[in-house]
């Protein structure tokens, strides 16, 4: 199973690289790497979507109740790539300014529910996943290190995002070309984040999903399974 998924990951990497190279040759690097709806954004969306599908496919029935936030987070990443946070309402479904804007109360309620759902997903990912992730890192599991590398890339992309605006605040103005370079770097980091998560999914052992609070019956005796076994 893992060997097949590693082949899938290698195929995805080759396909992504091919799309970016062809798009750069046809449209120029600035459009391919920085334009809204450009090649790099679309490939990132496809990678997140594939990661979510593979997680849902691999997750056994007993794990869904506790670990549903994992496929859910991939869905949220896809929605972010589609700019859903700025859609539907003015100033945007997930913009906090909506609570002080003159919009119908039901729109504020929908936004509050959406933000609450996202916050719940993130909290559950952290509180339920930090233990297994930490133990997997200690044991040198590749999927755990892939997740950490991806998170580092995501943090770096946030820091790079809007570098021109941040520098302008202290009196430094970047030429247009340099501004596009920073945008391209941000997009590449986000794509690296998506690929790192996909790699983690592809090298994760399907049999290693933690059983939380489940008793396994073996030879007529009830044996308490570890809550967080690491594959």
Label the model's feature ranges:
Residues 22-32, 90, 127-129, 161-174:
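Juxtamembrane "helix-exit" motif on the non-cytosolic side of transmembrane helices
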Residues 6-21, 69, 149-152:
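Alpha-helical transmembrane segments
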Residues 82-138:
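Membrane-proximal helix-loop-helix units in multi-pass membrane proteins
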Residues 14, 43-58, 110-125, 188-204:
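Hydrophobic cores of alpha-helical transmembrane segments in multi-pass inner/ER membrane proteins
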Residues 76-88, 152-165:
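C-terminal TM-helix exit segments that contain a strictly Trp-centered aromatic cap at the helix terminus
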Residues 130-152:
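Membrane-helix boundary/juxtamembrane motif in polytopic membrane proteins
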Residues 154-229:
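C-terminal transmembrane-bundle signature of multipass membrane proteins
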Residues 34-42, 97-112, 176-188:
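Short aromatic-rich membrane-water interface segments that cap or initiate transmembrane helices
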């Amino acid at each position: 199973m893992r060997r097949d998924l590693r082949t899938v990951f290698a195929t995805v990497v080759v396909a992504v690289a091919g799309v970016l190279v062809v798009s750069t040759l046809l449209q120029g690097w600035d459009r391919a790497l920085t334009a809204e709806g450009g090649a790099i954004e679309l490939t990132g969306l496809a990678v997140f979507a594939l990661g979510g599908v593979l997680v849902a496919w691999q997750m056994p029935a007993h794990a869904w109740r506790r670990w549903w936030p994992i496929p859910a987070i991939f869905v949220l990443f896809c929605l972010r790539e589609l700019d859903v946070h700025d859609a539907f309402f003015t100033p945007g479904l997930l913009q906090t300014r909506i609570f002080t804007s003159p919009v119908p109360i039901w729109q504020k309620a929908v936004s509050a529910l959406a933000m609450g759902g996202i916050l719940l997903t993130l909290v559950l990912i952290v509180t339920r996943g930090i233990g297994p992730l930490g133990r997997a890192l200690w044991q040198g599991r590749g999927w755990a290190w892939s997740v950490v590398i991806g998170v580092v890339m995501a943090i770096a992309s946030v820091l790079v995002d809007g570098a021109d605006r941040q520098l302008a605040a202290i009196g430094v103005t970047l030429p247009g070309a340099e501004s596009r370079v920073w945008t391209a770097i941000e997009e590449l980091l986000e794509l690296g984040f998506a690929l790192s998560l996909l790699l983690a999914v592809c090298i994760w052992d399907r049999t290693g999903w933690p059983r939380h609070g489940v008793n396994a019956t073996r030879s007529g005796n009830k044996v308490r399974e570890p809550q967080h076994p690491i594959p």
